[in-house]
Amino acid sequence: MKLLGSAWPAHMNKTVAETMHANIEKVGLPTWTEADQALAKAVQREMKVPETGLSTKINPLRGREVIPDEEKRGGGSDDIGDISWNVPTVTIGYPANIQAGPGHNWANAISMATPIAHKGVQYGAKVVALTVIDLLTRPELVTQAWDYFNNVQTKNRKYVSFLRPEDKPAIWLNKERMEKYRPEMKKYYYDPSKYKNYLEQLGIKYPTTEKPATKN
């Protein structure tokens, strides 16, 4: 029998989350230009979802200490859930793409070549840096984080990995597919030695919101 993978549901740390959210409110959201909003709404229109544009409001911190198992329907695309059961953990979600469809979708991916992603990553990095400084300079936060981890999160539930020592990553699953398509993908790799940004390499003027008209 081969075990292809497993993942625990994530349980994020209340203390670290509250600390990080305070820094999100301190840093604020990126200042979006008319071009940024125009591209976002054009993509949302194309995907037939509400044309809300890019986020301009910080959502309140939400969370529960106990979530019934039947409500746990989501998880990360990696082992972040397993990590969260071994050490106090949080993840940060900052507006760096366009809310226009399911994750891992072209509608989400296209913003990565635009100022939208650049701004979002910059602001998110500031929040992470401030949170790290808080944890390094305020030891009581670390104590509180571990207190929550030990006496709330793992009080009645202990982590056990589903993976055996002999289980290996299933990297063979896409071997043939990648051998076939990687040469085509390489044509689109960004070359920073020739272009200031990826849009310039692609020859796309920002923000292009409609398909250019073709001459008959």
Predicted regions and their residues:
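Metal-dependent amide/peptide-bond hydrolase catalytic core
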Residues: M1-N216
